[in-house]
């Protein structure tokens, strides 16, 4: 990340704009992975929300009115997401990713259960590990699976039963093979 302080300030400003639309967000993606002891290179900060398409459109307008460059990528019928707003500025790239009408329960639960913040006094809450694993399983693909393996390997004291329960609750498949791979990594 080019300037972590600048992107955090921008994300905190964006949270204020989200609240004006009665939305809340949870930090997901690489910043959440880093907060949970798995640091990998990233150039952006991702916020997970539950916002329908009309709200995403209105939010894009509000972001522009606040001086941000914001572009909404609307979902098509096959898209696993409910839309993505790219927020661009001197701070870098923020992405507001909606799971509304696709996978809203994981965001709702993460918002309710998140206790970790990016820094003291910040409104930026970090997705809990079980829900981060669920989001990565939902995303699928090699990179997301590799992220899960590394996340689990770097957090050996995790309650794996809780992660299994969360993933089962959302009817996500594929966790067991990743748990096996992670335990192999921890044994090395």
Where are these regions (language model features)?
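Compositionally biased terminal segments of proteins
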Residues: 1-188
């Amino acid at each position: 990340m080019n300037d972590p302080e600048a992107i955090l300030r921008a994300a905190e400003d964006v949270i204020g704009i989200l609240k004006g639309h009665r939305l809340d967000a949870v930090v997901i993606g690489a910043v959440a992975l880093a907060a949970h002891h798995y640091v990998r290179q990233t150039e952006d900060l991702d916020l997970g929300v539950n916002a329908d398409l009309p709200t995403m459109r209105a939010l894009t307008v509000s972001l522009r009115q606040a001086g941000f460059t914001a572009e909404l990528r609307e979902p098509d019928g096959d898209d696993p997401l409910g839309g993505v707003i790219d927020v661009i500025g001197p701070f870098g790239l923020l992405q507001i990713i909606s799971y509304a009408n696709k996978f809203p329960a994981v965001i709702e639960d993460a918002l309710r259960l998140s206790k970790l913040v990016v820094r003291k006094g910040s409104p930026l809450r970090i997705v809990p590990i079980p829900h981060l694993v669920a989001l990565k399983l939902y995303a699928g693909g090699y990179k997301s699976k590799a992220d899960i393996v590394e996340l689990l390997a770097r957090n050996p004291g995790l309650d794996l039963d809780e992660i299994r329960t969360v993933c089962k609750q959302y009817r996500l498949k594929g966790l067991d093979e990743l748990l096996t791979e992670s335990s192999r990594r921890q044994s090395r």
